[in-house]
Amino acid sequence: MESERLESHLLNKQEEEASSFTSGLLLSTSVVVAGSFCYGCAMSYSSPAQSKIMEELGLSVADYSFFTSVMTLGGMITAVFSGKISALVGRRQTMWISDVCCIFGWLAVAFAHDIIMLNTGRLFLGFGVGLISYVVPVYIAEITPKTFRGGFSYSNQLLQCLGISLMFFTGNFFHWRTLALLSAIPSAFQVICLFFIPESPRWLAMYGQDQELEVSLKKLRGENSDILKEAAEIRETVEISRKESQSGIRDLFHIGNAHSLIIGLGLMLLQQFCGSAAISAYAARIFDKAGFPSDIGTTILAVILIPQSIVVMLTVDRWGRRPLLMISSIGMCICSFFIGLSYYLQKNGEFQKLCSVMLIVGLVGYVSSFGIGLGGLPWVIMSEIFPVNVKITAGSLVTMSNWFFNWIIIYSFNFMIQWSASGTYFIFSGVSLVTIVFIWTLVPETKGRTLEEIQTSLVRLS
């Protein structure tokens, strides 16, 4: 009798999980990750466009470094307010704001005839993608059942990779102005499609919009689904968060939040200081510096980015976060060392043919390793580890820190390469080694655990 009850419970659970995967959930996720696609395009646009923009507008290396990095300054500014904005106007409205900024930014870049207009466009792109980097993972986490949370959250990284790949590939065939115009299409698409997806149920509950909350859940879970229990749980969670006063930046540094804060900030710092942003922004120059055809090199990178991201998206809820992060960091450590070694041997005039092989193997391995872990999982973990009463403040701080670390690397990379190409990648390899130790000692496994379980365990460890 007991076995029959257990079997019935398992069957009901399986049916509930299967029914949670609906066309409404898929549509909503597909629409919001169009913003992630735009983010990827913006990140890597500077790589294929560099030589032509510098030539046609007469820019120096310092000018172009600032143009590339000014987007991260814009991202930093909006990241500070991203949590407050999305809480005030809603997740969908925040995405509309980001789309307007991105469309204006791309048009300004496309029609720029001087450095001021070019930088203005890039700055507005930063404003847009700064909002995207916060609101997209938050919206996906709030609409997705825990069974699919990791995979659906990773679709954010998948579409970023798709945007990066598109720039690497099409940059070989299109003029930089045309490339900027094409990059505005995802934002224009999202502006229209946002009308057809629901607002986040959790945000609706925050403002007491009970009827709209149930309508939103019906769209996400299916018209025939029983959403009353989930709606009640959302209302209860929101009510608890109201009783726990929303904390400010000072409360975020309370001892109980220390472990979560170290994990969030640490992962963002190490993600950037491993050199990932530099490869996205300057891939063509990296190949040119090593004497390898940049059009062939960037095409190879474009081809490998998508399959590995799809594999991770489908397996992250099965394998877990920690194993993928460890594999990712180990791979990046080894591959950065190989890239540095190839530059070192080339500079000394040794094994020239071998250097090209080592470079392409190192870069392909690095990009693949980054994509399976450190590329997207820090954002997934960020959405899981902070208690609800500090989530807005913590999310804004961690997002801003990511943009700040990103700016440091992107602005300094050209100067680091001029100083020592091999030394630059040996430094990145060393940071990747530190990342391995950091993940092993501090980052918990969050697979298959509720947000409450994750956060309670971290508070105990603080």
UniProtKB/Swiss-Prot annotation:
Record field: transmembrane: 23-43, 70-90, 96-116, 123-143, 156-176, 178-198, 261-281, 296-316, 324-344, 357-377, 397-417, 423-443
Disulphide-bonded residues: none
Subcellular location: Membrane
Cellular-component GO terms for this entry: membrane
Keywords: Membrane, Sugar transport, Transmembrane, Transmembrane helix, Transport
InterPro entries: MFS_dom (IPR020846), MFS_ERD6/Tret1-like (IPR044775), MFS_sugar_transport-like (IPR005828), MFS_trans_sf (IPR036259), MFS_Trehalose_Transporter (IPR050549), Sugar/inositol_transpt (IPR003663), Sugar_transporter_CS (IPR005829)
GO MF entry, a single one: sugar transmembrane transporter activity
CDD domains the UniProt entry points to: MFS_GLUT6_8_Class3_like (cd17358)
Keyword Transmembrane helix: yes
Entries under Pfam families matching the protein: Sugar_tr
Membrane topology: Multi-pass membrane protein
Main location: membrane
Cross-referenced Gene3D superfamilies: MFS general substrate transporter like domains
Family to which the UniProt record says this protein belongs: Belongs to the major facilitator superfamily. Sugar transporter (TC 2.A.1.1) family.
PANTHER family: PTHR48021, SUGAR TRANSPORTER ERD6-LIKE 1-RELATED (PTHR48021:SF93)
Record function comment: Sugar transporter.
Protein name, entry field: Sugar transporter ERD6-like 2
Species of origin: Arabidopsis thaliana
Lineage: Eukaryota, Viridiplantae, Streptophyta, Embryophyta, Tracheophyta
